[in-house]
Amino acid sequence: MNGEYRGRGFGRGRFQSWKRGRGGGNFSGKWREREHRPDLSKTTGKRTSEQTPQFLLSTKTPQSMQSTLDRFIPYKGWKLYFSEVYSDSSPLIEKIQAFEKFFTRHIDLYDKDEIERKGSILVDFKELTEGGEVTNLIPDIATELRDAPEKTLACMGLAIHQVLTKDLERHAAELQAQEGLSNDGETMVNVPHIHARVYNYEPLTQLKNVRANYYGKYIALRGTVVRVSNIKPLCTKMAFLCAACGEIQSFPLPDGKYSLPTKCPVPVCRGRSFTALRSSPLTVTMDWQSIKIQELMSDDQREAGRIPRTIECELVHDLVDSCVPGDTVTITGIVKVSNAEEGSRNKNDKCMFLLYIEANSISNSKGQKTKSSEDGCKHGMLMEFSLKDLYAIQEIQAEENLFKLIVNSLCPVIFGHELVKAGLALALFGGSQKYADDKNRIPIRGDPHILVVGDPGLGKSQMLQAACNVAPRGVYVCGNTTTTSGLTVTLSKDSSSGDFALEAGALVLGDQGICGIDEFDKMGNQHQALLEAMEQQSISLAKAGVVCSLPARTSIIAAANPVGGHYNKAKTVSENLKMGSALLSRFDLVFILLDTPNEHHDHLLSEHVIAIRAGKQRTISSATVARMNSQDSNTSVLEVVSEKPLSERLKVVPGETIDPIPHQLLRKYIGYARQYVYPRLSTEAARVLQDFYLELRKQSQRLNSSPITTRQLESLIRLTEARARLELREEATKEDAEDIVEIMKYSMLGTYSDEFGNLDFERSQHGSGMSNRSTAKRFISALNNVAERTYNNIFQFHQLRQIAKELNIQVADFENFIGSLNDQGYLLKKGPKVYQLQTM
């Protein structure tokens, strides 16, 4: 915070006026003048000065006496914080003095203009308890704050109010002396009500422990924002007009709950009927917002078979509009209760209450800037690292073959598939997002998307769950039970107020993390909802008059089974999945897993499965990889690594033991890399990627195959940055680029190879065309000739079969062949066994 004091002159509004003598001048900014009785003839329009009863005219004297007595209270803002009468023997005085000493010592660390503008001050709980100013006078300050939070926070607020008042009075006296004005009278300053916001409060309470015994206690909890309501004005004090005498009183409404006064403040008046004056200057309102927090599930807190718990939180004053759905926040506040259903007809529901949190401070993990550069500010989900964590991260980073260790630690239960695991590991680390906060440029996503397609039983779902478990922020959903609104965002209607509120879906909750989607092929129409989120990394909503955009900066890892239950290499990826090319082209890597018999591989796989079932899996809880037993001690690991391709380097050779990194520690390592490491491409790495991209473009033009666009080049750059970030390096080297080129070639090998194992570059990589394009072209050309000759573009199924027989077209399944033409838009099905040619 800025320790400089700014704005001490009249023009900055530091104080309003001062008295030049005991009887001279009136200070217009005093809050006590709000208690003066207004002119009844203007307020009600009914009474005049002649009609006013005599007992009303006598009420000025007690108020004037009270205003005079207030001057002898040493704390100017006592009435703003406490309802009871000031007493020198009050136990609160000692607390206020302790907090006053604390704020007086640290006043230079705070920006006074900012405190007065916001009406709040941030107080670090660790500084409060570690410093001697408070703990010497209040030894059990933590217990006092936990058990009596409202009184303790009011004491803090009054203490900073007193410190600022004295500071302003001192500067007012200096200004009077500089301008040669007399200093005979009392200087009056107007400091607003200041709320003390305590942050860094410990310990964090788990949401499952927040029960009835926490009512009235001060707690801190961390969770994900899943719903945010609109900002509304909440009335805390209401002006009421007495119907009998016309007296106006300001009646407090605790927690914003409406209630009527029981009696008139005038002693001789017995009026019991009151009218609310909402536009009166005595009516006080504040900004109010409600959010819903969902608990964060960690390893030791996961409970099978139950949905995550949620709790409502109320934000007031300067806390409103401090978070959006999907943010991870730490909230400190007071646990309170509210009626379950205000308008319920059932009498039993009147005894049912709901717990909610009245927020005192909120810390948004995403709102804090982690690093700035010329490309814009990168925002990250801030994690906390202990000294033990940092030593473990340093030990992991010091490994020679770190890529191999992380790949084999990702999912040790699944044998093989090293390059697929490498792609998933690169998605966990991710690349660097460019131009995130530059409004003059379109942001470029840095999160890669991975698709794993293959036969059932090869461990796709387990690798997917392992990736979501290792990610610092991972959301796992299953495609066959997911709706479009569950993936993106839901617009729900609040039952109490009738307003619309946003509820975040899986992609928004996985912001700056991983979203794993299993059974990707069974999602139905939900694929269209992913198109915007995968490329623009945001979700736009336009429903019920609400138009907004929410961030969804997440890496999507999807696993899919082919339609027929077995992957048919005679078809393309699109035909196997029945999925559009627009969605498939957004995936950086598409891996094809096939269950092909291999005697050596099957022998190793069976040994691996039996060892795991027998409990012989090595689970030593350290982060080191054992040195290669089969390798000569004089040979450097780097020399061996540089000679072998990546697929060989990642394999665990017989006789070698790998001690995998525990997932809890690997999650810390990934979080540290995403938070602090932002690599850039070196010149050599950029040249390798450029040469590979140009070679792909040359082949696609020469062979008339699927188009290679800049999406492939951006994918290469993203994955290369992730490869450097995996080893905590700020620069991506030539070796990183070569590894990524090998992974990309492996991914393309599965999509381009046909049923005979040959590389057919005329096949569409993303499957927008037919498996055998020339056969389809010949058949459609023949249909065009027949339609032009007969002036009829309607064909029966037996006519289509006869034309194919005349052309000597050999296909394995003719019905499937016609269905593919229907999917591609060449034929339109008009009825049972009736098709219309669309190319006329």
Swiss-Prot record:
Task: Drop me one GO molecular function for this one.
Answer: MutSbeta complex binding
Broad enzyme group:
hydrolase
- Amino acids binding ATP: G454, D455, P456, G457, L458, G459, K460, S461
Q: In which tissues is it expressed?
A: Highest levels in placenta, lung and pancreas. Low levels in skeletal muscle and kidney. Expressed in various tumors with highest levels in colon and lung cancers.
GO BP annotations of the record are:
DNA damage response; double-strand break repair via homologous recombination; female gamete generation; male gamete generation; mismatch repair involved in maintenance of fidelity involved in DNA-dependent DNA replication; protein localization to chromatin; protein stabilization; recombinational interstrand cross-link repair
Q: Fetch the InterPro entries from UniProt.
A: AAA+_ATPase, MCM, MCM8/REC_WHD, MCM_dom, MCM_lid, MCM_OB, NA-bd_OB-fold, P-loop_NTPase
Q: Name one GO cellular component term.
A: nucleus
Gene3D superfamilies for this protein: 2.20.28.10, Nucleic acid-binding proteins (2.40.50.140), P-loop containing nucleotide triphosphate hydrolases (3.40.50.300)
| Up-regulation conditions | By E2F1.
Q: Which residues carry this modification: Phosphoserine?
A: S630
Localization recorded for this chain is: Nucleus; Chromosome
Where this protein primarily resides, as one coarse class?
A: nucleus
Under Enzyme Commission nomenclature, its number is 3.6.4.12
Residue ranges of every copy of the MCM domain listed in the record: 402-609
Entry keywords, A to Z:
ATP-binding, Cell cycle, Chromosome, Disease variant, DNA damage, DNA repair, DNA replication, DNA-binding, Helicase, Hydrolase, Nucleotide-binding, Nucleus, Phosphoprotein, Premature ovarian failure
Changing E341K has the effect of: Decreases the formation of MRE11 and RPA1 foci in response to cisplatin-induced DNA damage
Functional description taken from the UniProt entry: Component of the MCM8-MCM9 complex, a complex involved in the repair of double-stranded DNA breaks (DBSs) and DNA interstrand cross-links (ICLs) by homologous recombination (HR). Required for DNA resection by the MRE11-RAD50-NBN/NBS1 (MRN) complex by recruiting the MRN complex to the repair site and by promoting the complex nuclease activity. Probably by regulating the localization of the MNR complex, indirectly regulates the recruitment of downstream effector RAD51 to DNA damage sites including DBSs and ICLs. The MCM8-MCM9 complex is dispensable for DNA replication and S phase progression.
The UniProt entry's sequence similarity note says: Belongs to the MCM family.
Task: Give the record's disease field.
Answer: Premature ovarian failure 10: An ovarian disorder defined as the cessation of ovarian function under the age of 40 years. It is characterized by oligomenorrhea or amenorrhea, in the presence of elevated levels of serum gonadotropins and low estradiol.
What is said about its interaction partners and assembly? Component of the MCM8-MCM9 complex, which forms a hexamer composed of MCM8 and MCM9. Interacts with the DNA mismatch repair (MMR) complex composed at least of MSH2, MSH3, MSH6, PMS1 and MLH1. Interacts with RAD51; the interaction recruits RAD51 to DNA damage sites. Interacts with the MRN complex composed of MRE11, RAD50 and NBN/NBS1. Interacts with CDC6 and ORC2. Interacts with HROB; the interaction recruits the MCM8-MCM9 complex to DNA damage sites.
Q: What is this protein called?
A: DNA helicase MCM8
User: Gene that codes for this?
Assistant: MCM8
